[in-house]
């Protein structure tokens, strides 16, 4: 791997072309032709003088008298095609074949030398090493191992973590050039040793930034290092990666002592140890990795004690305390080594739609993998309802279309074998898919269509299903009603210490006599259900949780109104009580979201369209005065409340705290709209 990053250059370096510009053969050819490219009366262009050192008399005239390099004369000067291309920003690529040149690695012939040399000189001038800022000067001093200059620039306010315009930092420059003294000074000044390089490869960087690849190549070699393979990708490499590539023990030691992470991976997924040669550097890295892992385990354990998983999950999920506690306990066993390492952890989430099953899986993955996208794999099992679609799961066998692409699951598990895998709506999958999942849950490994085995015993598999959701919802509502009645009876008996609780627990009798027969009838095999570590039940929301859902949704729209329209949105407490009535137990939190959109957002959109909302105003959502009594009088019949539900209105709050109702014109009724043919 090291050989792929360190260049073994056999072809002439781009800087060698500048030496060719000074060659006697080129001068003698110029004398024979009597032609030169000049500007002004000094016989040489200013940009060419800068390219070869900035001194008069050092730049030779360019060959322009023959072949394809010859251009038209305009006002006493010769303009070659390459110069014209440079003027329009279209320099030829080094890999392109030029007149008189067989390839980039070949030797330029006399006929094409003037064209390519002119292009090179233009590039070098554009990227000449004359720092225009303290940050650029800091990187130049770091490359030159000038410790005094580095200290002076830092004292004058140079940013120690500033990036070169192509992506690297001064610490990376010092590390790759084996300047351990500069590394020590930069670390003491607060340089971050774990920053990754934004530079990928010469050609990709040139494409991304819209500049010529030769410009990037010369800049990389001049400002960074000329021993690296310019076709390899260095994106994400830290200063420690570069120090290991340079095989400099002292620099590696300085970086590790300064807090560099020996386990940090670059974009290719490689740690610094992957690039180490046999010797002292490799031994040092192995020892450091072991120590760093031990420190990391202690730090994470302390963090888990201070901020338990259940508390983190509750920040993102409303309600479902029993489900959160079940998942948190299982994850805690796994994190602390109290689990079976031969089998993966398997959950089955049961409950109605829109009740938090998928969100709990996402937050679990976020906790386990620190926001890494590869750490969460989601498969919609409704895409695997037919038998022939099983091939998409693990990959097509040899000879079939899609064999080389691999399966949706196996391909992602190869990238992250310890991922959190969500099988959404598993009840819709074909039975053959369940057979594959049975092997996956039992042995913790999977064989793809190419015959390769993926070991995923460290993964977490979560299945969601709407099977038995109606039974679970009705049972939970019944338990909640019974608990409410019991609390009211005890309050009526003057037991002042009684508190009404919304917490309920699904009984074991209900799980065994109601839920398990339904699951067995659907999945048709006890061995599949037996591989599930925990069956987690998601219950309908209680009233207090619905109020939280309403406030969360209103806060979302208040933030959107402030960001997009500079409108401050407020609401009364009674508004949440009105919107809660839109809850549907079968649709969960989505029914609250839709109710807010219908009754609040529709009015906001209509008022904005009718130009009733001035910029920077303050809006308040309130309940009509005539309907507030309806909310305060529970004795009103349900039929009366059904005929006339409470109405919400929008009010603008003036600077003097006075309010006035917005007169929003209702759109025409669909039946009154006349369509003209």
Swiss-Prot record:
The record marks 126-127 as: Cleavage. This is Mitochondrial disaggregase. Homododecamer when substrate-bound; the homododecamer consists of 2 homohexamers stacked head-to-head via ANK repeat-mediated interactions. The active substrate-bound form is likely to exist in a dynamic equilibrium between homohexamers and homododecamers. Homotetradecamer in the unbound state which is remodeled upon substrate binding into the homododecamer. Interacts with PHB and PHB2. Interacts with MAVS; the interaction is enhanced by Sendai virus infection. SUPFAM superfamilies: Ankyrin repeat (SSF48403), P-loop containing nucleoside triphosphate hydrolases (SSF52540). Residues 477-505 are annotated as: Regulatory. GO terms for cellular component: cytoplasm; mitochondrial intermembrane space; mitochondrion. The keyword Electron transport does not apply. Pfam families: AAA_2 (PF07724), Ank_2 (PF12796), ClpB_D2-small (PF10431). Its EC number is 3.6.1.-.
């Amino acid at each position: 791997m090291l050989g792929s990053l360190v260049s073994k250059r056999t072809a002439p370096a781009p800087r060698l072309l500048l030496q060719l510009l000074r060659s006697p053969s080129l001068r003698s050819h110029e004398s024979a032709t009597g032609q030169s490219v000049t500007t002004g009366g000094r016989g040489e262009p200013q940009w060419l003088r800068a390219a070869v050192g900035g001194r008069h008399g050092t730049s030779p005239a360019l060959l322009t008298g023959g072949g394809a390099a010859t251009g038209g004369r305009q006002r006493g000067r010769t303009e070659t095609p390459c110069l014209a291309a440079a003027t329009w920003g279209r320099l030829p690529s080094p890999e392109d074949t030029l007149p008189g040149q067989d390839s980039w690695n070949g030797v330029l012939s006399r006929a094409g030398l003037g064209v390519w040399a002119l292009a090179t000189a233009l590039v070098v001038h554009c990227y000449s090493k004359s720092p225009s800022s303290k940050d650029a000067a800091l990187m130049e001093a770091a490359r030159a191992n000038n410790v005094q200059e580095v200290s002076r620039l830092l004292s004058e306010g140079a940013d120690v973590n500033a990036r070169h315009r192509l992506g690297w930092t001064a610490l990376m420059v010092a590390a790759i050039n084996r300047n351990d003294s500069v590394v020590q000074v930069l670390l003491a000044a607060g340089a971050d040793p774990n920053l990754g390089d934004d530079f990928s490869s010469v050609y990709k960087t040139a494409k991304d930034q819209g500049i010529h690849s030769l410009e990037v190549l010369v800049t990389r070699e001049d400002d960074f290092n000329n021993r690296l393979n310019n076709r390899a990708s260095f994106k994400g490499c830290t200063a420690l990666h570069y120090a290991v590539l340079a095989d400099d023990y002292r620099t590696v030691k300085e970086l590790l002592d300064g807090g560099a992470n020996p386990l940090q991976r670059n974009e290719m997924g490689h740690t610094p140890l992957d690039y180490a040669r046999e010797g002292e550097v490799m031994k040092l890295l192995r020892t450091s990795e072991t120590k760093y892992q031990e420190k990391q385990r202690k730090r994470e354990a302390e963090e888990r004690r201070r901020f338990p998983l259940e508390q983190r999950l509750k920040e993102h999920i409303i309600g479902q305390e029993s489900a959160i506690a079940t998942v948190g306990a299982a994850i805690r066993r796994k994190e602390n080594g109290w689990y079976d390492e031969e089998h993966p952890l398997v959950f089955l989430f049961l409950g109605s739609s829109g009740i938090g099953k998928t969100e709990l899986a996402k937050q679990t993955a976020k906790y386990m993998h620190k926001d890494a996208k590869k750490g969460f794999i989601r498969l919609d099992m409704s895409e695997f309802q037919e038998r022939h679609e099983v091939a998409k799961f693990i990959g097509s066998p040899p000879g079939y279309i899609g064999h080389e692409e691999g399966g949706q699951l196996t391909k992602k598990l190869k990238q992250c074998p310890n991922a959190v895998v969500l099988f959404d709506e598993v009840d819709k999958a074909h039975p053959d898919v369940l057979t594959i999942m049975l092997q996956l849950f039992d042995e913790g490994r999977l064989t793809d269509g190419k015959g390769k085995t993926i070991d995923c015993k460290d993964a977490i598999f979560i299945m969601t299903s709407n099977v038995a959701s109606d039974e679970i919802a009705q049972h939970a509502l019944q338990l909640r009603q019974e608990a409410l009645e019991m609390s009211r009876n005890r309050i009526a008996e003057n037991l002042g210490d009684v508190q009404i609780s919304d917490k309920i627990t699904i009984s074991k009798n209900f799980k065994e006599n109601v839920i398990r027969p339904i699951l067995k009838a659907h999945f048709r095999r006890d061995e599949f259900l037996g591989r599930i570590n925990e069956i987690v039940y998601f219950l309908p929301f209680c009233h207090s949780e619905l109020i939280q859902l309403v406030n969360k949704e209103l806060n979302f729209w208040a933030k959107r109104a402030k960001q997009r329209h500079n409108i401050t949105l407020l609401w009364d407490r009674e508004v949440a009580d009105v919107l809660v009535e839109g809850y549907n137990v079968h649709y969960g939190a989505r029914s609250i979201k839709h109710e807010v959109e219908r009754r609040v957002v529709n009015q906001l959109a209509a008022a904005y369209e009718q130009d009733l909302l001035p910029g920077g105003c303050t809006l308040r959502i309130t309940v009509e005065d005539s309907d507030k009594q309806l909310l305060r009088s529970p004795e009103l019949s349900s039929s009366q409340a059904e005929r006339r539900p409470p109405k919400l209105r929008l009010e603008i709050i003036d600077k003097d705290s006075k309010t006035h109702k917005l007169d929003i014109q209702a759109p025409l009724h669909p039946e009154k709209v006349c369509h003209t043919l």
